[in-house]
Amino acid sequence: MSLSRTQIVNWLTRCGDIFSTESEYLTGLDREIGDADHGLNMNRGFSKVVEKLPAIADKDIGFILKNTGMTLLSSVGGASGPLFGTFFIRAAQATQARQSLTLEELYQMFRDGADGVISRGKAEPGDKTMCDVWVPVVESLRQSSEQNLSVPVALEAASSIAESAAQSTITMQARKGRASYLGERSIGHQDPGATSVMFMMQMLALAAKE
């Protein structure tokens, strides 16, 4: 079983929905350790992504993901725009001309996208950033691919891993970004970027079941 282009479009549509619904929650998280604008930025960015989907829904997956990345780069403020934009642009390079993705191809897409984020943000696991979710998600997909699991099962597992990983940032001290200025006071708060990655994985798991 593979993930279809239509399911990718549904995923991005669901991301638009979740970032609208959870905008205030994400901004609340960011208020504790950041600029108090993460939820607003993600909502604005994915609203723009969803607006553009009808005109490109018949294109290949790589085209759709690149368009998503460029839209996020141009419409999301702060550090999140470049990081999430980079993820989708790098993911697009791994999915050029594809109408569907096997689990192995999905793993490669996430691996390349996450590598782009890590390279651009210069963060490592344990820094209390979205990389604390991307890294275990990629590893989960790699293991699922090796075990020849179905795409829906693999993405459900990755979604569960993402939730646990996002929650794990609560006990971390931030070493990157504005949150790092707080030192030990950053401990006890969940990272908003990591939480956004969690929401994205939850939405992909749902889209894969459709």
UniProtKB/Swiss-Prot annotation:
Keywords: ATP-binding, Cytoplasm, Glycerol metabolism, Kinase, Magnesium, Metal-binding, Nucleotide-binding, Transferase. It is found in: Cytoplasm. This is PEP-dependent dihydroxyacetone kinase, ADP-binding subunit DhaL. Pathway: Polyol metabolism; glycerol degradation. Disulfide bonds: none annotated. It is an enzyme of class 2 (transferase). GO terms for biological process: carbohydrate phosphorylation; glycerol catabolic process; pyruvate metabolic process. It comes from the Bacteria. Its cofactor is Mg(2+). ADP-binding subunit of the dihydroxyacetone kinase, which is responsible for the phosphoenolpyruvate (PEP)-dependent phosphorylation of dihydroxyacetone. DhaL-ADP is converted to DhaL-ATP via a phosphoryl group transfer from DhaM and transmits it to dihydroxyacetone bound to DhaK. DhaL also acts as coactivator of the transcription activator DhaR by binding to the sensor domain of DhaR. In the presence of dihydroxyacetone, DhaL-ADP displaces DhaK and stimulates DhaR activity. In the absence of dihydroxyacetone, DhaL-ADP is converted by the PTS to DhaL-ATP, which does not bind to DhaR. PANTHER family: TRIOKINASE/FMN CYCLASE (PTHR28629), TRIOKINASE_FMN CYCLASE (PTHR28629:SF4). Its EC number is 2.7.1.121. InterPro entries: DhaK_L_YcgS, DhaL_dom, DhaL_dom_sf, Dihydroxyacetone_Kinase. It catalyses: dihydroxyacetone + phosphoenolpyruvate = dihydroxyacetone phosphate + pyruvate. Unlike the carbohydrate-specific transporters of the PTS, the complex DhaKML has no transport activity. The tightly bound ADP participates in a double displacement phosphoryl transfer reaction and thus plays the same role as histidines, cysteines and aspartic acids in other phosphoprotein intermediates. The lineage of its organism: Bacteria, Pseudomonadati, Pseudomonadota, Gammaproteobacteria, Enterobacterales. Homodimer. The dihydroxyacetone kinase complex is composed of a homodimer of DhaM, a homodimer of DhaK and the subunit DhaL. DhaL also forms a complex with DhaR. Induction: Activated by DhaR. PROSITE patterns: DHAL (PS51480). It comes from Escherichia coli (strain K12). Residues 6-206 form the DhaL domain. ADP binds at H38, G39, L40, N41, A79, S80, G121, M130, R178, D191, P192, G193. GO terms for cellular component: cytosol; transferase complex. GO terms for molecular function: ADP binding; ATP binding; glycerone kinase activity; magnesium ion binding; phosphoenolpyruvate-glycerone phosphotransferase activity. Transmembrane segments: none annotated. SUPFAM superfamilies: DhaL-like. Complexation with ADP increases the thermal unfolding temperature from 40 to 65 degrees Celsius. Its main location: cytoplasm.
